[in-house]
Amino acid sequence: MGIIDFFMALMQDMILSAIPAVGFAMVFNVPHRALPWCALLGALGHGSRMLMMSAGFNIEWSTFMASLLVGSIGIQWSRWYLAHPKVFTVAAVIPMFPGISAYTAMISAVKISHLGYSEPMMITLLTNFLKASSIVGALSIGLSVPGLWLYRKRPRV
């Protein structure tokens, strides 16, 4: 894959991840003036995750680092635009939720309960469940850590 193809794939990923970020921001009643910023933050988060995964990081660590970036930028923008950081960050990380692995784990659980136990199906269930849980944990920890760092009143040492 050439640099132009990679750049075009990255731009496509960022544009397509901005759309659900705006959609969920509208569901959460984010003010209209903040919708473009939610789209930009969703695109930056998903694009940075894709960039790190292309560099060789696994999806869990890439998601953690991308959510750290989203949380930090959201806190800075909340100071500039006098809004709560969750206005920008919550809708921006929703495109990074692990839909495919969670769905595969759920389908595996249904197949096990319907067809009976089989070792390959149980391995698929556990693998996808742990992957989805790790990604959701990375998202939640990555969003909360910048607030703990930046809003700390006492000295760290």
Swiss-Prot record:
It comes from the Bacteria. The transporter is composed of YjjB and YjjP. PANTHER family: SUCCINATE TRANSPORTER SUBUNIT YJJB-RELATED (PTHR34390:SF1), UPF0442 PROTEIN YJJB-RELATED (PTHR34390). Involved in succinate export with YjjP. Both proteins are required for export. One of its GO terms (cellular component) is plasma membrane. Keywords: Cell inner membrane, Cell membrane, Membrane, Transmembrane, Transmembrane helix, Transport. Pfam families: ThrE_2. The chain crosses the membrane at residues 6-26, 55-75, 87-107, 129-149. Belongs to the ThrE exporter (TC 2.A.79) family. This is Probable succinate transporter subunit YjjB. It is a multi-pass membrane protein. It is found in: Cell inner membrane. Its main location: membrane. The lineage of its organism: Bacteria, Pseudomonadati, Pseudomonadota, Gammaproteobacteria, Enterobacterales. GO terms for biological process: succinate transport. It comes from Salmonella arizonae (strain ATCC BAA-731 / CDC346-86 / RSK2980).
